[in-house]
């Protein structure tokens, strides 16, 4: 779990720092064969932060298939869809994430993204 938590922390706290994102990717790639939602979420979000939206989508859709969606995970998949040119699929995920009224890393980004879609 330590590698997962550090990778997510780096992706969330230093999204503009290339060396931090590279380290996050190295840490998260060990989860490529995982079937556990938290690990897939981290890997997908790290791909997203690195600008690899196709891989992010593939991994986060695997995460969604586990059925273990949380507001933060909905946000991650929604943002990935938005960056991938799929606003129609992004919107309900982002609406659900924000409407859950549970704080999560990125809630302000989710609200801003919704404003850009509507």
Predicted regions and their residues:
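Start-of-helix register in tetratricopeptide repeats
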Residues: 1, 38, 72, 106-109
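Canonical tetratricopeptide repeat
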Residues: 5, 42, 76, 110-113
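TPR/TPR-like (Sel1-like) alpha-helical repeat modules
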Residues: 82-105
């Amino acid at each position: 779990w330590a590698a997962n938590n550090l990778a997510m922390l780096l992706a969330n706290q230093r999204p503009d720092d290339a060396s931090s994102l590279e380290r996050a990717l190295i840490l998260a790639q060990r989860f490529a064969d995982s079937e556990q939602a938290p690990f897939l979420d981290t890997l997908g979000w790290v791909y997203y932060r690195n600008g690899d939206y196709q891989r992010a989508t593939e991994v986060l859709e695997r995460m969604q298939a586990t059925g273990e969606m949380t507001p933060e995970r909905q946000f991650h998949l929604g943002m990935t869809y938005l960056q991938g040119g799929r606003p129609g699929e992004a919107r309900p995920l982002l609406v659900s994430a924000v409407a859950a009224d549970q704080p999560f890393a990125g809630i302000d980004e989710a609200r801003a993204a919704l404003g850009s879609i509507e």
